[in-house]
Amino acid sequence: MYHSRWKNSHEVAGFSYGERLYKNVIKINFEKYLTKEKLSYSQKVIRIYEKYYPEIVEEIKGFAAGQKSDFEKVFAFLAGMYVFTYDTQCSMVAVSNKNGIFFARNSDFLTKIEKLADSVLYKLDKGFHLLGIQQLW
């Protein structure tokens, strides 16, 4: 299991992660997973992301730059990841109140892909810190 450390700003953290994957010959072919429907969806929701969660947009821009990929394609892939997935048992919840917007999700973890998993320490300049598990590409 890999242990990544996300730090600094959202954009810098995203760039560092995307670049680290790229330098380790993990260049994600986002276009392979896109459809016209997913691209259309992402173009509609980008304004919502920019209004309510601009930090994630900055993080995705950084990640796309680190991967040497087009932001629009990376965003379309990520924004539609759970919207257009029909056969998983994952769950998501989001809550908004005077303290901010809180989003959590679980992605079912298969132990057979443990070597492709990342234990993430997410400690950016602003916001809450977290430790979580994610599947690598």
Describe each region flagged by the PLM.
Residues 1-137:
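N-terminal mature-domain region immediately after signal-peptide cleavage
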